[in-house]
Amino acid sequence: MDFFNPFIDPTRGGPRNTVRQPTPSQSPTVPSETRVCRLIPACFQTPGRPGVVAVDTTFPPTYFQGPKRGEVFAGETGSIWKTRRGQARNAPMSHLIFHVYDIVETTYTADRCEDVPFSFQTDIIPSGTVLKLLGRTLDGASVCVNVFRQRCYFYTLAPQGVNLTHVLQQALQAGFGRASCGFSTEPVRKKILRAYDTQQYAVQKITLSSSPMMRTLSDRLTTCGCEVFESNVDAIRRFVLDHGFSTFGWYECSNPAPRTQARDSWTELEFDCSWEDLKFIPERTEWPPYTILSFDIECMGEKGFPNATQDEDMIIQISCVLHTVGNDKPYTRMLLGLGTCDPLPGVEVFEFPSEYDMLAAFLSMLRDYNVEFITGYNIANFDLPYIIARATQVYDFKLQDFTKIKTGSVFEVHQPRGGSDGGNFMRSQSKVKISGIVPIDMYQVCREKLSLSDYKLDTVAKQCLGRQKDDISYKDIPPLFKSGPDGRAKVGNYCVIDSVLVMDLLLRFQTHVEISEIAKLAKIPTRRVLTDGQQIRVFSCLLEAAATEGYILPVPKGDAVSGYQGATVISPSPGFYDDPVLVVDFASLYPSIIQAHNLCYSTLIPGDSLHLHPHLSPDDYETFVLSGGPVHFVKKHKRESLLAKLLTVWLAKRKEIRKTLASCTDPALKTILDKQQLAIKVTCNAVYGFTGVASGILPCLNIAETVTLQGRKMLERSQAFVEAISPERLAGLLRRPVDVSPDARFKVIYGDTDSLFICCMGFNMDSVSDFAEELASITTNTLFRSPIKLEAEKIFKCLLLLTKKRYVGVLSDDKVLMKGVDLIRKTACRFVQEKSSQVLDLILREPSVKAAAKLISGQATDWVYREGLPEGFVKIIQVLNASHRELCERSVPVDKLTFTTELSRPLADYKTQNLPHLTVYQKLQARQEELPQIHDRIPYVFVDAPGSLRSELAEHPEYVKQHGLRVAVDLYFDKLVHAVANIIQCLFQNNTSATVAILYNFLDIPVTFPTP
C-alpha cells in the first residue's frame, strides 16, 4: 500500500511508487499496555496474494486521510469523531429543556454513592433504579439525564398465614449474585382486571428500589401460593405511566445537577435529577437535529460467501452515510476502508492499515458522533452480527464500551433459533440491542410494507425509488480489492450507494417518524416498536387505563386454553359475473364490535359464574354462545368496558388529527400528523389480537371468540337483509325510483371477514353507483348499534370469483383488482404471469370471450365436450398454442422463467428436503456461493434433465445463463396450463383437474407430461 503502514514493511507495498510516511511529529506513541494481534490483507505485502498476515503490535488504532495520519482514539475519553461533532457545550445551571428519543433502565449499587449527588445517595442503597433519558438539548447538544427515585412495584394477594416479609427476605438472601434491593410493602385495595367483579381486594403493594430481583421475588411468592399482579411491568413503564411522561418528546428539568466527574455516558452533557424535577411538554412536536446513520459492510469471502469466524474473511470496507433530521443538505458520505483507495466524488475516504483499526473507528463513531438512529439493509441478520463476531471473536473489543452509556451497556444482536420446537420462529425477527441507539432495519420494514417477488435491495430500490444498485457480485469483490486503489474505489462506490439507497428508503417511508409516533401512543421505547410485536403496545395502554379505574392486571399462568373458531366467511358462489358487484365493508369491524357490545375483561362473566351476580337482571348483560358454552358481558350502564374506552379515545383523537391534517400546510408537521393517525389505526386493530393470543401478555379467548362470532352474525344478518330487498322496496327505502330490469335482485355471492360481495343482477353501473352508499347506510341503521358502520367500498363492472380469498375483476374506474390468483403470487414466474394475464384480459375485456365465459359458467363440466367450445373461448386456446411455440423456440428469456420461494427456516428444519428452492440452496452451498438468508426468496429455473425428480431440475438462474442450459419446456407449459386453469376453473364447477383436461383436449400441440 502506498501510505505508511506501521505494521508491515512499506517497501513491499502496493502498486504506487510514492510511499507516504509520517513526519517525526506525527509518529504514534506506543502504549506498552495495549498489545493487539492485527490481521492485514496479504495483498498489502504482495499484490494479488490471498489470505492475511498476522502482526502482533502495540500501535494505537491509526487512520489516513490523504497525506495525513491520525489516531482513532484521542486521550482516554475521546476519538476522532468527538472532535468532529463540534464544540463542547456548557451545561445550564438551573433550567434544562431537552428532547428524549430513548430511555434505558440501569441499576446503581451502594458502591456508586461517591459518583452521585448527596441527595440521591440513599436512593441507591443497597441498590436503586436509575433511568437514563437520552436525547438532545435545545441547541442540539447530546445529553444524558440520569433520573433517580423511580421505584418499580407489583402486587400480591397472599393466602392466610403467609408471612410476606419473611418470604421476601428469604428470596433476597438467595439472590443468586444479583444486586440486593430495598423493599417495602403497603396494604392497598384494588379491583382485579380478570372478569366482572364488584369487589375490591386487600392486596399488598411491594415496592422495590431496583428491578433485577423482581422476577425472583415474584416466582418465590407464586411458589408460596400467592397470586402476583403486574410483576411484568418494568421501571420505564412505571416512569411513563405513573407521571404522565412519554418515551419520545420534550422534557423540562427544573433542577438539573451537571455531572462533570464520574461520567456515566458518552454524550456531550450529562445531568442527574429526580423524576419529581421533570415535566413533559406534550405541545411541542418538532424534532431536534437527530443524526441517522445508514451503513453497509463489504467482506472478502475468498472461499465463498464470507464467514465471520474465518480470519481471512475480514471486513474490508464500511460505508457510512449520515443525515440530520430537519436538514435538507446533502448526506454526509464516508467510506472506511482497508488500504489505499482512489478518491470518490462527494465521499470522505478514511484509509486504515488493518481491520482492527477500521473497526475501532466505526465502533467509536456509533458512540461519539452523536448518532441516535442507525439503519441499513438486513443489518440485523448480517452486518451487525458480522461486525460483532469479528470484533469479539477475532479481536478482543469490549463492545459495551461503544454504546451511549457506561453502566448497564448492551451491544448485541438476539437472533431467533430454529428447531422442531422453535415456536414462532418463522414470524420472529432478529433484535438489535445497542444501548442508546434506535435500530431500523429497512429490510424488515420493506418486507412488512411491500409485496414483491423478492426483497433484495436492488428490487426494492427499483420499485420504490426508480433506481438501481451499482451491483457487484460478492465473487468480484476480492479480486477488485486486491487489484489496488482503483478496484477498491469501485467496491467503495458500490458500498456507499447501498447506504444512500437505504437512507432514501427510510426517508421515503419516514420510518423514524412512524415508530416514534407508535412509541408515544403505546408508551414504549422507540427501539422496541419494530421488533417487539403489538402485544406490548396494547398492554402499556391497558395498564394505564386500568390504573385510573383502580384495577390491577394479573400475570398469565401460561396454562390458557388455546384455539377458538376464528373469522369465517359466507362461502363464495364461483363463476363469472357480468353484472355490477357491490362490495360493502364494515369500518374498523373488530374495534367497533368491542365498543358496541361493551366487551372487556372488566365486563366478562363466564357462563358458570352468572349466579354469583344475583343483582344483575337479563337487561344488564348480553349473552353470547361460544364453542365452549355461553358467556356474558355486562352492558355499559352497569360498567363501561376499559377496552371500549381506549378505542373511543383513540378513534376520536384520530378523527381530530385527520381533520387537522386536511388543512395542514407545514410539510414536517404534516408528516408527523399522518404518522400519528396511522399509529392509532394500527394500535386499534391490535386490540382484538391482544386478547386472542393464548401465549400473550393478558389473553382472554372469550373476548376474541365473541368478536369473531359477532362478525360472522353481522355478515349473515346483512346478507339476509340485502337479499330480501326487492326493486320496489329499494325504491321505497331510497324514496326515489331506480332504473332496473323487472327481474332485478340482490344476491350475496361472497362474504369475507368484514366485507360482502353483492351481485346486483339487472342493475346498471350508474344505478348501483348512485345508491351504493345509501344501501350501506340503510343496512347499518336497520341492523346494528353504534359505532358499527357498513360502507360502500368498491364496485366491480364484472367479476371472476374463484374461491375464498381468490377473485379478479374490473372496477368502476376500469382498473383490474386481483386477489389470491397466480398472477400476483410471489412464487409465479413472469412468463406464466404474463400469459395468464393475457388470458385474463381476454375474459374481462373482450366481448366475445366474456360472452363465452358467461355461457360456460352456467353449464355442466362435460358440456364443452358435447357442444364444443364457444367461439370466443377459442382465443384462449390460441394464446396457449402460441406460448408453447415460444418455449420450444427458446425465445423466452431466463429471467421470465424464474420462480422464487421463501427460505422460511434453516435448511435442517425442513422435514421435506426435495423442494426446488432447497435444491438450489444445496447447489449454491456445494459451489461455495453466496447463501440466502432466512426469509429471503430463493430464485430457481427448471432445466431439461429427463428422468429426474422435478425438484432436482431446479437450478439458479445465473448458473443457467452462464452455462446455456435448456429449460424444461413441457414442465413450464404444464405450469402455464394449470395457471390458466386456476383462473378459469370457476367456469367449470371449480374442478381444476377437469379444467386442465379440457384445455389439453382442445390444444393443438404434442405434449409429454413432466415427471411429478
From Swiss-Prot:
Annotated SMART domains:
POLBc
Q: What domain of life? A: Viruses
Assigned keywords, A-Z = DNA replication, DNA-binding, DNA-directed DNA polymerase, Endonuclease, Host nucleus, Hydrolase, Multifunctional enzyme, Nuclease, Nucleotidyltransferase, Transferase, Viral DNA replication
Instruction: List the catalytic activities from the record.
Output: DNA(n) + a 2'-deoxyribonucleoside 5'-triphosphate = DNA(n+1) + diphosphate; Endonucleolytic cleavage to 5'-phosphomonoester
**Keyword Nucleotidyltransferase applies:** yes
Write out the biased-composition intervals (Low complexity).
21-31
> What Gene3D superfamilies does its record include?
DNA polymerase family B, C-terminal domain, DNA Polymerase, chain B, domain 1, Helix hairpin bin, Palm domain of DNA polymerase, Ribonuclease H-like superfamily/Ribonuclease H
Give positions of region: Disordered. Answer: 1-31
Classification via InterPro entries: DNA-dir_DNA_pol_B, DNA-dir_DNA_pol_B_CS, DNA-dir_DNA_pol_B_exonuc, DNA-dir_DNA_pol_B_multi_dom, DNA/RNA_pol_sf, DNA_pol_B_thumb, DNA_pol_palm_dom_sf, DNA_pol_type-B
Q: Can you supply a Gene Ontology BP term from the record?
A: bidirectional double-stranded viral DNA replication
State which Enzyme Commission number(s) the record gives.
Answer: 2.7.7.7, 3.1.26.4
Query: What would be an example GO MF term here?
Result: RNA-DNA hybrid ribonuclease activity
Which cellular components does GO assign to this protein? host cell nucleus
- Annotated compartments: Host nucleus
Function of this protein?
Answer: Replicates viral genomic DNA. The replication complex is composed of six viral proteins: the DNA polymerase, processivity factor, primase, primase-associated factor, helicase, and ssDNA-binding protein. Additionally, the polymerase contains an intrinsic ribonuclease H (RNase H) activity that specifically degrades RNA/DNA heteroduplexes or duplex DNA substrates in the 5' to 3' direction. Therefore, it can catalyze the excision of the RNA primers that initiate the synthesis of Okazaki fragments at a replication fork during viral DNA replication.
Spell out the family assignment given in the record's similarity comment. Answer: Belongs to the DNA polymerase type-B family.
Q: How does it assemble?
A: Forms a complex with the ssDNA-binding protein, the DNA polymerase processivity factor, and the alkaline exonuclease. Interacts with the putative helicase-primase complex subunit; this interaction may coordinate leading and lagging strand DNA synthesis at the replication fork.
Listed name of the protein:
DNA polymerase catalytic subunit
Lineage per the UniProt record: Viruses, Duplodnaviria, Heunggongvirae, Peploviricota, Herviviricetes
